[in-house]
Regions:
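Acidic, proline/glycine-rich low-complexity IDRs
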Residues: 1-21, 25-150
Length: 150
């Protein structure tokens, strides 16, 4: 099964929010070569896999506003070096949650790539403040977009 088949170890105080199951989405440009396994094209898919395995390997959880650093740029053609999870943009109301037949819910999160200074800003402030600065940024990945924290 996919990531949503695994129940994540969500802190007890958040149990009421049904955050144990998640699936990830990333918006790539229509001309992105998803079949090219060179790192300049493959890193978004690699990160979907890394993130899907992370809660299992670390017995932890991923949710809204969480960031994961790479420590270095994803590929030679971009300075992006980390990701943040947000609610999917440009979807119909309610499309960010899927109700399962047994009553459990799967939450969908959009993966957005960040620059190192944006990661640092989020850690120093919070996800909400960073997203406020990103309100003009397209939800579609643009490896050449300007940083919102320079």
């Amino acid at each position: 099964g996919g990531m949503g088949a695994h129940q994540m170890n969500v802190p007890q105080e958040l149990a009421e929010y049904k955050l144990e199951r998640a699936e990830l989405v990333i918006y790539l440009p229509a001309d992105w070569d998803v079949y090219d396994h060179s790192e300049k094209n493959y890193w978004p898919l690699r990160w979907l896999k890394i993130l899907a395995r992370l809660p299992i390997g670390e017995d932890s959880w991923l949710g809204w506003g969480h960031t994961v650093p790479n420590g270095e740029p994803f590929a030679e053609n971009t300075r992006f070096s980390g990701i943040m999870l947000i609610n999917p943009e440009n979807v119909k109301k309610g499309a960010d949650v899927c109700q399962l037949p047994n009553g459990e819910e799967v939450n969908f999160y959009q993966v957005i790539p960040l620059y190192e200074e944006e990661m640092n800003f989020k850690v120093t402030h919070n996800a909400e403040t960073l997203l406020g600065r990103m309100d003009k940024v397209s939800p579609v990945v643009d490896i050449h977009r300007a940083s919102v924290c320079e």
